[in-house]
Amino acid sequence: MLSCWVLLLALLGGACALPAPLGYSQALAQAVDSYNQRPEVQNAFRLLSADPEPGPNVQLSSLHNLNFTIMETRCQARSGAQLDSCEFKEDGLVKDCAAPVVLQGGRAVLDVTCVDSMADPVRVKRVWPLVIRTVIAGYNLYRAIKKK
């Protein structure tokens, strides 16, 4: 009888010792940290955006992939600094990342893959304002010549 109680207590104690399931925001932070641990990463990267954005209605268990964008900061990758306190680097690299979500025993195993972002908002050149100014200048020149 005593062995049954010991077995029951061991089972209940083991169930209580299981780690809490990983949340979506925690999984994103873990994925960014995983990328920052790579040897080729000099400056740490910080989360720029995620799809979907973190919120109370987003469950990690319902996702097949983590899709997010990171940007280079001014902090060294392995300096131990809090990423939230690191400023984004001006003209820093922007990377689009994906990580398949594989849940093993309530824990997420993430294999992060990142590529350089094609849409770098810093380097976008706007052509239309230049075209409009050129047309207006040409029209004004035409009117000035026509008056003479």
Swiss-Prot record:
Tell me, in one coarse class, where this protein mainly resides: secreted
Disulfide pattern: 75-86, 97-114
Keyword Secreted assigned to the entry: answer is: yes
Which N-terminal stretch is annotated as signal sequence? 1-17
Tissue occurrence: Detected in gizzard, liver, small intestine, large intestine, cloaca, bursa of Fabricius, gall bladder, lung, trachea, kidney, testis and bone marrow.
Q: Give the keywords, sorted.
A: Antibiotic, Antimicrobial, Disulfide bond, Immunity, Innate immunity, Secreted, Signal
Q: Where in the cell is it found?
A: Secreted
**Any one Gene Ontology molecular-function term assigned to this protein's record:** lipopolysaccharide binding
Listed Pfam families: Cathelicidins (PF00666)
Q: Which residues form the propeptide?
A: 18-122
GO biological process entries: antibacterial innate immune response; antimicrobial humoral immune response mediated by antimicrobial peptide; defense response to Gram-negative bacterium; defense response to Gram-positive bacterium; innate immune response; macrophage activation; positive regulation of adaptive immune response; positive regulation of cytokine production involved in inflammatory response
Task: Give the GO cellular component terms, alphabetically.
Answer: extracellular space
Chain's role: Binds bacterial lipopolysaccharide (LPS). Has potent antimicrobial activity against Gram-positive and Gram-negative bacteria (in vitro). Has hemolytic activity (in vitro). May play a role in the innate immune response.
- Entry's family note: Belongs to the cathelicidin family.
Q: What is this protein called?
A: Cathelicidin-1
